[in-house]
Amino acid sequence: MSAVYNFCAGPAMLPAAVMKKAQAELLDWNGQGVSVMEVSHRGAPFIQLAKDSEADLRELMNIPDNYHVLFMHGGGRGQFSAVVNNFLGDNGKALYLVSGQWSKAATEEAKKLAGDNSIDVINVVEKVNGLNKVVIPALSGNGSEYRYLHYCPNETVDGIEIFDDIDSPWPIVADMSSNIMSREIDVSRFALIYAGAQKNIGPSGLSIVIVRKDMLELPQLTQSSIMDYRLTAENDSMYNTPPTFAWYLAAEVFKWLKSVGGIKGMAEVNAEKARRLYACIDSLDFYKNGVAPQNRSQMNVTFQLADESLDKDFLKEAEALGLVALKGHRIVGGMRASIYNAMPLEGVDALVSFMRSFAAKHSS
């Protein structure tokens, strides 16, 4: 079978080495004689897996000791609710920066739970010379106006990424579902980081929460046990049955990432993948990207064909070559190539080669 490169935005492709290992030990994990899907989450073998995976993630991201690492249910949308419910009791307020579809969705969920008067919003994307550019105003305050500031560093739908650190007098909460572990960050700048697993961590069904311990002292809005950070931390993410198979695969992804140079090494590869793809887009009038260069996502490269009538042909011919899931999100249309950690350089090179040949064939 010829190679297939999966550019899906999520659930996304997993590293081939991880998939092969999971296949090899699917029926007999860790010498147990049964699948990891069949063992008790409270048994010693899985407890060890949980401890090892947390240790690996802490090492990869250099997570300080004053942070909890939680393995939870619910994905990113689940965390939209969890953040509000855990931090906005006693009439607390929060500030949300909107840079695209996912930060907008988080804002809408926050308003639904806490009420419009508890959520202030700043739209931070402006059209500059016809391109979407992130412009974050100076944020000033004494630190007591808001319980937290929420933003999404990478917008998968819009192809927008915020690379610069945000200077905020309030604790920063970040939805890193689509760019976690793609480049180095200083975790200590954040009060909470959350990420749905299905892009750079593992399969869907799992979410990672990295939360500074002092944040758990804030009054809760509601006490929903399943998404209670305090309860989850007190029970080592085992208050209820976790998504064990997704956790196992995440643990294997962490090991794989360590073996290929860690986040520093992966960041170099990711930057090169994005550079090659954007260089192709910019060098041909046949394609266009609507994001300012400094905010172009390294994970989700969006582009449109100059002649939209060729969209279906582009997708059909790409798929025939094993380049799949390139259709853009229904809200924005066009194309989207998601090139998360697991996408090899060879996949990007194959896409670039096809894009150049397709453009040559259809250019007048």
From Swiss-Prot:
Belongs to the class-V pyridoxal-phosphate-dependent aminotransferase family. SerC subfamily. It comes from Shewanella amazonensis (strain ATCC BAA-1098 / SB2B). This is Phosphoserine aminotransferase. The keyword Chaperone does not apply. Homodimer. NCBIfam families: PRK05355.1, serC_1. It is found in: Cytoplasm. Keywords: Amino-acid biosynthesis, Aminotransferase, Cytoplasm, Pyridoxal phosphate, Pyridoxine biosynthesis, Serine biosynthesis, Transferase.
